[in-house]
Amino acid sequence: MAFELPNLPYAYDALEPHIDKQTMEIHHDKHHNTYVTKLNSAVEGTDLEAKSIEEIVANLDSVPSNIQTAVRNNGGGHLNHSLFWELLSPNSEEKGEVVDKIKEQWGSLDEFKKEFADKAAARFGSGWAWLVVNNGQLEIVTTPNQDNPITEGKTPILGLDVWEHAYYLKYQNKRPDYINAFWNVVNWEKVNELYNATK
């Protein structure tokens, strides 16, 4: 198979009480695994099997039209979730160069969190909220479904899944509560690493 489900870098219950064990098990083992399975099925026998998922999603226009939708949805789902797991950590420490850059652009970390949370909560239906690097500047964007900002030439360095499957077992229809809890488990070390890689 061309693409594989990555292991979580922590235990299923490591993010509790903010993200519960059952949600993590279903989200990783079922939802993400399904994206991988369907992506592999779509690209089987094509030259896409030899490409990285980042390269594929960044160049969706070059994907054959008969599999483009399947690759966009499932390739995006695989890429987004692979990144999402790494952006979470039970040891969240708000420090590093990216935090300084956020404070410089937004005035404070709280102002940044408020704008990010507002945009994540306002994302209609299923999708993602992102902090991206765009031409050297930080920007908050949202994408529908499993779309990823790299398709538009932007580099995601922080992402939040706001599909209901990411939070409904614990938070039901209270998406803002889930968004607030997210800040307790952000892996700022990884965010910094991704930010520094864009320089």
From Swiss-Prot:
**Reported cofactor(s):** Mn(2+); Fe(3+)
Q: How is the cofactor bound?
A: Binds 1 Mn(2+) or Fe(3+) ion per subunit.
Q: Which cysteines are joined by disulfide bonds?
A: none
Has the keyword Repressor been applied to this entry?
no
Question: What is the enzyme's class at the highest EC level?
Answer: oxidoreductase
Could you tell me which Gene3D superfamilies the record lists for this protein? Fe,Mn superoxide dismutase (SOD) domain (1.10.287.990), Iron/manganese superoxide dismutase, C-terminal domain (3.55.40.20)
UniProt keyword list: Iron, Manganese, Metal-binding, Oxidoreductase, Stress response
Q: Which residues participate in Fe(3+) binding? A: H27, H81, D161, H165
PROSITE patterns linked: SOD_MN
Please give the catalytic activity noted in the UniProt record: 2 superoxide + 2 H(+) = H2O2 + O2
List the GO terms this entry assigns under cellular component, sorted alphabetically. Answer: cytoplasm
GO MF terms, alphabetically ordered: metal ion binding; superoxide dismutase activity
- EC number(s) from the headed UniProt entry: 1.15.1.1
Which residues participate in Mn(2+) binding?
H27, H81, D161, H165
Q: What does this protein do?
A: Destroys superoxide anion radicals which are normally produced within the cells and which are toxic to biological systems. Catalyzes the dismutation of superoxide anion radicals into O2 and H2O2 by successive reduction and oxidation of the transition metal ion at the active site.
**What is its quaternary makeup?**
Homodimer.
Q: Which family does it belong to?
A: Belongs to the iron/manganese superoxide dismutase family.
Protein's name in the database:
Superoxide dismutase [Mn/Fe]
